[in-house]
């Protein structure tokens, strides 16, 4: 997959920045009002009862703040957070090592939880339900099962593919929160806050322009601001103005709706080769040279969100809105 400026996936250079920008409390957290308000109630109720918070599943497109919310949950509960990911847990023993190291009340955050192997999920079930761990000792006829008690803990799982979770695992989460794309106003506030951290002056109109092209995603908004800041320092006087912002984003090939060359390639491929569709996912994959799951999980969600693409039983269809965006005539049926 191409390295994309507009990818919601975390890149190496994002890690330190996101840590420094990360809000510590729900009050500081911008956006996701529905999920935030529900979590406020659930956390306060758990603290009043002096219990651990129910297990939480956070799902939605990448870059919307799932990792940030997991850390905030731990902060609000006044406990530590232990972070791992589905791909990092290769064997049941790996999960057992993580679980037995937890302290009472701790938050265990598993990113990409949909990538856990089914055999590891089965170890997780009793840990989530009964706070215990069943371990098989020995092999063959002499093998025996030993049950270890675990301290009460909260599992926070994050996924971009909630549908890929097995039903037994999904059903063990007491709190399910879908994170939605951010509004332009919310992203503009995030851009201005990030500019303060960077100690960079930014015009409010420039912040809005970056927000409009950030695909509803804070991670992308912050990444665009970093690149525009570079242009402001080299081609301007250091202030991020509307003029500098528009010039920078044009040179970076980010159009007014936040579409880049890969989005154009996908949409125009369907329009020019298949008369706008319907066309199957595998055919689209072969046409643009990207894996089907990458198209489905990374490229399509935003195009669906803005109404440029439709998924139908017969395949993908490019909508009239996309034709208008490209200044193309809609083909007659």
Swiss-Prot record:
Protein name listed in UniProt: Holliday junction branch migration complex subunit RuvB
Record-listed E.C. numbers: 3.6.4.-
Its Gene Ontology cellular component terms are: cytoplasm; Holliday junction resolvase complex
Record bears the keyword ATP-binding = yes
Q: Which UniProt keywords apply?
A: ATP-binding, Cytoplasm, DNA damage, DNA recombination, DNA repair, DNA-binding, Hydrolase, Nucleotide-binding
Which Gene3D superfamilies does the record match to this protein?
1.10.8.60, P-loop containing nucleotide triphosphate hydrolases, Winged helix-like DNA-binding domain superfamily/Winged helix DNA-binding domain
Q: Name one GO biological process term.
A: DNA recombination
Q: Which SMART domains match?
A: AAA
Function, as annotated, reads:
The RuvA-RuvB-RuvC complex processes Holliday junction (HJ) DNA during genetic recombination and DNA repair, while the RuvA-RuvB complex plays an important role in the rescue of blocked DNA replication forks via replication fork reversal (RFR). RuvA specifically binds to HJ cruciform DNA, conferring on it an open structure. The RuvB hexamer acts as an ATP-dependent pump, pulling dsDNA into and through the RuvAB complex. RuvB forms 2 homohexamers on either side of HJ DNA bound by 1 or 2 RuvA tetramers; 4 subunits per hexamer contact DNA at a time.
The residues that the entry says bind Mg(2+) are 67
Q: Show the catalytic activity.
A: ATP + H2O = ADP + phosphate + H(+)
Q: Which residues take part in binding DNA?
A: 311, 316
GO MF term (any one)? ATP hydrolysis activity
For whether the record's keyword set contains Transcription regulation, the answer is no
Subcellular localization(s) per the UniProt record: Cytoplasm
Q: Where does ATP bind?
A: 21-22, 63, 66-68, 129-131, 172, 182, 219
Top class in the EC scheme: hydrolase
Region Small ATPAse domain (RuvB-S): which residues? 183-253
